[in-house]
Curated annotation (Swiss-Prot):
EC annotation from Swiss-Prot or TrEMBL: 2.5.1.7
Xref: InterPro entries: Enolpyruvate_Tfrase_dom, Enolpyruvate_Tfrase_sf, MurA_subfamily, RNA3'P_cycl/enolpyr_Trfase_a/b, UDP_GlcNAc_COvinyl_MurA
Pathway(s) it belongs to: Cell wall biogenesis; peptidoglycan biosynthesis
Superkingdom: Bacteria
Family note: Belongs to the EPSP synthase family. MurA subfamily.
Catalytic activity: phosphoenolpyruvate + UDP-N-acetyl-alpha-D-glucosamine = UDP-N-acetyl-3-O-(1-carboxyvinyl)-alpha-D-glucosamine + phosphate
Positions contributing to UDP-N-acetyl-alpha-D-glucosamine binding: 93, 122-126, 308, 330
Compartments, record wording: Cytoplasm
UniProt modified residues of type 2-(S-cysteinyl)pyruvic acid O-phosphothioketal: 117
Keywords associated with the record: Cell cycle, Cell division, Cell shape, Cell wall biogenesis/degradation, Cytoplasm, Peptidoglycan synthesis, Pyruvate, Transferase
One family name in Pfam for this protein: EPSP_synthase
Protein name: UDP-N-acetylglucosamine 1-carboxyvinyltransferase
Amino acid sequence: MDKLIITGGARLDGEIRISGAKNAALPILAATLLADGPVTVGNLPHLHDITTMIELFGRMGIEPVIDEKLSVEIDPRTIKTLVAPYELVKTMRASILVLGPMVARFGEAEVALPGGCAIGSRPVDLHIRGLEAMGAKIEVEGGYIKAKAPEGGLRGAHFFFDTVSVTGTENIMMAAALAKGRSVLQNAAREPEVVDLANFINAMGGNVQGAGTDTITIDGVERLHSANYRVMPDRIETGTYLVAAAVTGGRVKVKDTDPTILEAVLEKLKEAGADINTGEDWIELDMHGKRPKAVNLRTAPYPAFPTDMQAQFISLNAIAEGTGAVIETIFENRFMHVYEMHRMGAQIQVEGNTAIVTGVKALKGAPVMATDLRASASLVLSALVAEGDTLIDRIYHIDRGYECIEEKLQMLGAKIRRVPG
């Protein structure tokens, strides 16, 4: 297993390009199954989950054509099997997203129950109940979800999500795109990635309205056609590199991104003392060599502060002036990185869903282990400011969400290298 070795102390300075958003790319790839002709999706990040999704299509008999810029063309008409097998699904939760499109377009689907990150209990029952509301017959047996559309196809339905679910909203929205009649999704997720998926469905000739609000209305259409689409930038990658600049007292400009999808994070960075300038597709952060000030924050569904940026701000607070409280309201077990940061000398107390972080002047390099995707990013940030060397093990977690993290950080002046395990 690869490891990262980071020598702390370099002040980051420079410019980098932000990759496409994995959490938009995965549902958009799944939605290509709805089309009745070839679809091209561009700006895909080069990440394991994306390759797994493309491999899953290959397993179903679709042969995606990929160019060197990681643009992929998918022709769903060549599908041969409607089964998403366990060995691919187990490594990636998002494969549940093929369930809705397959039932809507082909009338049936068999999808293994998913695997993925070890955070909290992420149930798939909302996906199942939503499809049942549209008339699908569903059985869960032998670790597989087996779904069949009724005679004449799925029917539009009113569906209320009793908890806000991003993948649940996406799955039902995709199924509704080809259902007969109107579907109304209430208490829907409002994330920008949901909006990106809705824009993609509409680019294929769909009729989705209200994405980005908690009520989404979908008028089903007879067919969805070929389209060319570019995936939105990754707001979490954007935020992570901005925090990297902030913790090191540096200056970083991130390009090919969108400041409007990151407002809660930018506000907190300003509160921490950063100077921030933005353009249409870039953000520049300058700390002028200052140590950040500690901030209090509470994670909540979009447009509030994102849970996927929580760990990075614990790293910021760990070396900041003062004490900050971080309250996690989305996932349980999301402070696993704290115990690794203790090894580096961080002063963090966890009480239930709250982490109280008292900033120290300096962290010390130590061997640490990544436990999940965003936690691993926080260890990288802490290592950038720690005295001496930090060895981060199990970095396959990082590779699931960050494209070429060591190369991008090297471009900003970080002393970081990957070593084979």
